[in-house]
Amino acid sequence: MITGPAVDHAIEKAKIYPKLNVGLHLVLTNGKAILDPSEIPELINSVGEFRTSQFYSGIKYFFSIKTRKQLKKEIRAQFEAFSKTGLKLDHVNAHNHMHLHPTIFNLIIEIGRDYDLTAIRIPNEPPLNSIVDNKKEFMIRYFRWIFFMLFTYFMKKKCKKNNIIFNDIIF
């Protein structure tokens, strides 16, 4: 997380291992923005933190042109900050799987072209990757998985169209 509190330490450690594949984990929810709050007021609160509600943020990202412009600016700023580390960009994903959001995913591909993006980590998980001991939890996980698979299907198609590689599965 390029905006995380341990980013300098992580960069220092990554440079020790030049063959280590390092990705950009975009922060667009539940974390700090890289840009000043005055530049992206639609995205963050007064102390520079993204909103915690992924649902609310997702609605704004999709329907508000003003918010999308600011989102594009923030995503580009995070790509640029990663670029300045001197590390080779291996892949991109987003905190809390926010790159599943079609607006964010499209912006990642668009902006990523300027930063030699070749791979995106897609949250393609097995249907029930852990034991569930109650029916309600089972149903929640099952419907979440269906939702994810719908989005990941379209993500994979778009990646193929743009010559971007992606993982087969994650756990």
Where are the predicted features?
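Glycine/small-residue-rich hydrophobic helix-like segments
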Residues: K158-F171
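Acidic (Asp/Glu)-rich catalytic clusters
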Residues: V7-N21, E42-G48, S83-K84, R113, ...
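Non-cysteine beta-strand/loop elements that form the S-adenosyl-L-methionine
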Residues: N21-L28, S46-Q54, I122-P123
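Aromatic/hydrophobic pocket-lining residues that form the small-molecule binding cavity
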Residues: V7, L71, I75
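Catalytic domains of cell-wall/extracellular-matrix polysaccharide-remodeling enzymes
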Residues: T67, R76-K160
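Structural preference for beta-strand elements that scaffold enzyme active sites
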Residues: K19-H25, K88-N93, A119-R121, I165-N167
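Active-site gating loops and adjacent loop-to-helix segments of metal-dependent hydrolytic enzymes
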Residues: A33-K66
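Active-site beta-loop-alpha junctions enriched in small/polar residues
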Residues: M1-G4, H25-G31, H95-H97, E125-P127, ...
